[in-house]
Swiss-Prot record:
Pfam families: PMSR. It is an enzyme of class 1 (oxidoreductase). It comes from Arthrobacter sp. (strain FB24). Belongs to the MsrA Met sulfoxide reductase family. The lineage of its organism: Bacteria, Bacillati, Actinomycetota, Actinomycetes, Micrococcales. Has an important function as a repair enzyme for proteins that have been inactivated by oxidation. Catalyzes the reversible oxidation-reduction of methionine sulfoxide in proteins to methionine. The keyword Repeat does not apply. Keywords: Oxidoreductase. One of its GO terms (molecular function) is L-methionine:thioredoxin-disulfide S-oxidoreductase activity. Coiled coil: none annotated. The keyword Oxidoreductase applies. This is Peptide methionine sulfoxide reductase MsrA.
Length: 174
């Protein structure tokens, strides 16, 4: 079992896709990368905590390779925009990868190099050591599964799910 902590904009988006991915056993929305010891959604959204919205994606490598998890990450958000994803603007929405081991750091750096060719502009994804992972409030866990009709889900998340189905259908559950 391996766990990657990834930030690619609003955590609801990555959560929605990874929840449907074969071999993924857990997706937990949370916050990391900042200085506030007790972050919550409102403090993180204020931009004063330094934290990013992230997901901790746990997966079985014998079912899905780490490289596929990371390539999906780069396909599902724009890693070339600093501190924003579409209409979501602020440091909490930065493209980020948080590692616990040197092996993970190397995997992340290789994924950036591998995926750079897909983008016209330089990838600005932050690669940092994971300080502390703070689990987000219950309201944010499995958000898409609980609220698929909500406007944000319809306008922002559904196109990401469609993209995942188009390019990664072999890795998604039916």
């Amino acid at each position: 079992m391996k766990t990657f902590v990834l930030g690619g904009g609003c955590f609801w988006c990555l959560d929605a896709v990874y929840q449907k991915t074969k071999g993924v056993t857990s997706v937990i929305s949370g916050y990391t990368g900042g200085h506030d010891r007790h972050p919550d959604y409102y403090s993180v959204c204020s931009g004063t905590t330094g934290h990013a919205e992230v997901v901790a994606v746990s997966f079985e490598e014998d079912v899905i390779p780490a490289e596929v998890i990371l390539d999906m990450f780069f396909a599902l958000h724009d890693p070339t925009t600093l501190n924003r994803q579409g209409y979501d603007v602020g440091t909490q929405y930065r493209s980020s990868m948080f590692y616990e081991t040197t092996e993970e750091k190397i995997l992340f750096e290789e994924a950036i190099e591998r995926n750079q060719a897909l983008w016209a502009h330089p990838i600005v994804t932050e690669v940092s050591r994971l300080p502390v992972f703070h689990v987000a409030e219950d309201f944010h866990q499995d958000y898409y599964a609980k609220h698929p009709e909500q406007g944000y889900c319809q306008v922002i998340i559904n196109p990401k799910l469609a993209k995942a189905r188009k390019y990664y259908s072999a890795w998604l559950n039916a």
